[in-house]
Amino acid sequence: MKPSERRKARRLAVQAIYSWQLSGNNIADVEHEFLTEQSLDGVDVAYFRELFAGVATKKTQLDELIIPHLDRPIDEVSPVEKAIVRLAAYELTFRKDVPFKVAINEAIELAKAFGADESHKFVNGLLDKLVARK
């Protein structure tokens, strides 16, 4: 598997997590929507499914890891940043095969692509604190 296939899976997963967070729709429905309506060229679909389902089913556990490192209530974190840090926290916690530097760098790149101007700094700082605690 090429690293770019996982990168594309992360990108799609962040979009699905974002959609799920905002819509409150069933996980299976959101996954189906993304798998049928998005281009899957070069996407590691199995990894996308794992990331999306993992974040959705472990949201409470992931938030418990994230919240102590926030400078504001989690409800005040933008939905994009929340999706990105939840995905990265999932990889850092449950995917020991993914080096922490890779998980953090990928999250920073996602924040640059989807977040506001300073999102990548927020994501980087938060994930650095999360890794330091482990």
From Swiss-Prot:
Keywords recorded for this protein, A-Z: RNA-binding, Transcription, Transcription antitermination, Transcription regulation
Keyword Transcription regulation among UniProt keywords: yes
Pfam families the record matches: NusB (PF01029)
A GO MF term: RNA binding
Record SUPFAM superfamilies: NusB-like
One GO term (biological process): DNA-templated transcription termination
GO cellular component: cytosol
UniProt key word Transcription regulation: yes
PANTHER family: ANTITERMINATION NUSB DOMAIN-CONTAINING PROTEIN (PTHR11078:SF3), N UTILIZATION SUBSTANCE PROTEIN B-RELATED (PTHR11078)
Primary role: Involved in transcription antitermination. Required for transcription of ribosomal RNA (rRNA) genes. Binds specifically to the boxA antiterminator sequence of the ribosomal RNA (rrn) operons.
Family: Belongs to the NusB family.
Protein name listed in UniProt: Transcription antitermination protein NusB
